[in-house]
């Protein structure tokens, strides 16, 4: 028995005790057994339950000891809260007192309005601190006092104190029982009998007193336990309810107190703006007066305002050096290192005129604005520049950069001194910052990126006015919606709560790039096209002069009720389908549309994903890259529950760790999801990151778990900012001695794709790359005009192939059929089966640029140099250069016989002038002599392509109806995909030095006359007829060569043609005036897109198959101008071959 008791006392866990000791007695059983024993001691079985009572008391004592320990910790924590709250109240009272005194100082002076504001804020702080003091009193009375009473009363002492009387009664009973048992055995032994056991009935009367004492102490113990249970359970919770009501009153009263100042705060914000303007004006006047007085005190002409100006002799010697001098100028520090204003800049063009330009110096960068506001300003890093005064003109100075010299002139001598001082000081400051280390440089670069993003956001359509009331220059951003509002409307956005709109200031808050994702991709116009599509008439939309009541009613209806949004889905399943499509197509505006229709963003998708129960956010994270983070950000900020789990228990945090998405993880952790949720494998997201060695995800999750994660975080994202080069000049735009505009830099070929392809497959297509890779891919995939399937065992898709975009760089028209580079050099092995609509390619002779002039080709018969592939006798001299990428003929061989590609008949060339000379048309050429032959190795299995039908003389006129191509008329898809090329097989990326020099204005020929055009046309035809016999013979035998040898010979021959293409006997091509863009049409033209198209430049239009475009003008016959029907903000130029003209 004693050994059993010792085993019981060794247990420490309540659960293990209850599980290992089944022989217990409940209170009801104890009452029944004791009552029966009291009424009939001889027949009672109470003695058999004594051990059960002992076990029960032991377990209850263990439970009470655990509760005592837990309640002591609770009391300690609550007391710490109370003490820190008292300190906080005291600090708030001190703050309010000092603020009130500071405001009183203003009241006694000449700024009573500011003093009143400080006093009101002091009063607000006092009232809030009083409310907090009341809350702390409630915490003390309701929680601390209750815990104190319980721990110092019934639970006082240590483990075992409560059951000491019970233990004594048990001990007495045992001793008496042992004594009687011994006597009975001795008595039986005297009579020659052996007693094995003694029944309770035999000793019932003898043990009655001890049994009654045991029962009494058991009752006392159970009564005590019952009282403790009531106090630690029901009573404590009732007091916590009282404290909850005190908390509710605290927050409600605090909100009421703050609301009292709301109207005053709104008025104060406007008054502060006016006061600041007045103070700025005073400062400006004082600064001007200071400068005037300072200039009158200058006596030595060689030392102006502390700025050392070298003598004329020294200046002359320095100007003759033409480089950097050993000793730099020392600027007057009083002028600082930042300045904005206007300078006259001498152009480097033909006329050498002075042009007034807005300039700004900040952070070691000189910014020079262009004459046209739609161009990014040029930026010069002053660390690589030198300022040199002009000895001949006291108001002029030169700025020598690494590649050119800028000539500036100030308005007067004082302004001249200021500019030179600021430039010198800013350069010195930037140099000091550079020497401090990389950390400050990184911070500055991140700040510069943030500023550039904000500037780009402010240039988005509609962002120049408030999204809700139309006030100009809004500076308050809703980070979860991507819109800009004014300060009045932003206050109402704050009232609605962060679950509706999260407001930040573009000017006052320090934003991270993660908070600008949606702002960069939405814009006020795009957002209102959805959220204000069904505005009633008359419109309830407020104006800049509307009062706060009107604004609040409208904004609440717009953002909370979505009353004015466009409705496109009739059922919840349709909404979920639209949500899925929006994520798959990465269409943020489509996502906003389903959000406006009230879809539950965290509902499981209807289409099964990697795991059952995937939500849109799971899918967006799983398929995310640096171009789709804005979709993830929108879902994270606008869905209610980030802890939604899939069927196997994975949250979105688990997905980030599983698929290695640290940038998505940053966006998620900003909204503080639960980081310790486990999946069915018992793993948290942090466990998965550690197991998969996802270091970035592990670090971020560890920071979040320890509470050290910074929500203003930077994310790696393809921002696609419209920034020009640092040292770009605007002289080509400003001088304008002739109508020829500066050529654009080489751009990559556009690639189109079927609308049925997933985003992953689109990314695998050649040429479909991020802007970072676009330039590199453009050379390897430039002439790809045919896409083939990567799987030969799948049937041909009924969707036919799209044509390539008409190239948009000026070049000469070819006279022979163009060939394509080997498909193996361009097609990714990871792409899925891809078959597209194939239409005749546009004439390669025209490549669109800003400076394309009309063509001199005469109307009537086609170019005589156009020869089918089967009868190729070589290109004419006027087409050699243009065919650098297109002149490599392909030859596909089979196991039985060689198969030549069928003839392809091109449409007639549009009437354009071949603008550039041969030596200026090399901007896309590669050094073909250095390209390995493997680069141009052709596929060993290409099915024969049928001959294409002729298109007719010319593309259809803009007002004529172009018939939509039928599936049956289109040629079949090639057979087998060649092997994927290795990295070493690709041609080298062209360097800047390989590009041709920019044509100067003086090199351009004069305006052409009609006779010159006819003479040029005749000379062109004549040169096509007269070909050297050796060249014809050589080209006729290329079919007998192996593919590798043929490709190498073609490359070397093309390179030699490029170098010897100048023909002195031919007259130089005249340059006419550029064709005017035709925008005046009496009837609205509508065209329907029949392919997908991804824009390569900002002025081009991105669209998908099936959209309708309103034509607003023509840039030329191959490129038209227009916008998507119903979405005027989506506008730009588009290729004619990608659309079908509608009859209406």
UniProtKB/Swiss-Prot annotation:
Task: Give residue spans, biased composition: Pro residues.
Answer: 947-958, 971-981
Q: Which residues carry this modification: Phosphoserine?
A: 729, 738, 851, 855, 1023, 1042, 1056, 1143
- Kindly list the positions at which Phosphotyrosine occurs in this protein: 308
**Molecular function GO labels:** GTPase activator activity; phosphatidylinositol-3,4,5-trisphosphate binding; phosphatidylinositol-4,5-bisphosphate binding; phosphatidylserine binding; zinc ion binding
Subcellular location, in the record's words?
Answer: Cytoplasm; Membrane; Golgi apparatus; Golgi apparatus, trans-Golgi network
Q: How is its activity regulated?
A: Activity stimulated by phosphatidylinositol 4,5-bisphosphate (PIP2).
Instruction: Report domain PH positions.
Output: 336-428
Sequence ranges of Basic and acidic residues compositional bias: 735-746, 916-926
Key word Ligase present: no
Q: Biased-composition ranges for Acidic residues?
A: 725-734
Annotated Polar residues bias: 312-330, 747-759, 1030-1049
Describe the subunit structure.
Answer: Homodimer. Interacts with SRC and CRK. Interacts with RAB11FIP3. Interacts with PTK2B/PYK2. Interacts with CTTN. Interacts (via SH3 domain) with APC. Interacts with REPS2; the interaction is direct. Forms a complex containing RAB11A, ASAP1, RAB3IP, RAP11FIP3 and ARF4; the complex promotes preciliary trafficking; the complex binds to RHO in photoreceptor cells and promotes RHO ciliary transport.
Q: What is known of its domains?
A: The PH domain most probably contributes to the phosphoinositide-dependent regulation of ADP ribosylation factors.
Q: What's this protein's name? A: Arf-GAP with SH3 domain, ANK repeat and PH domain-containing protein 1
**Name of encoding gene:** Asap1
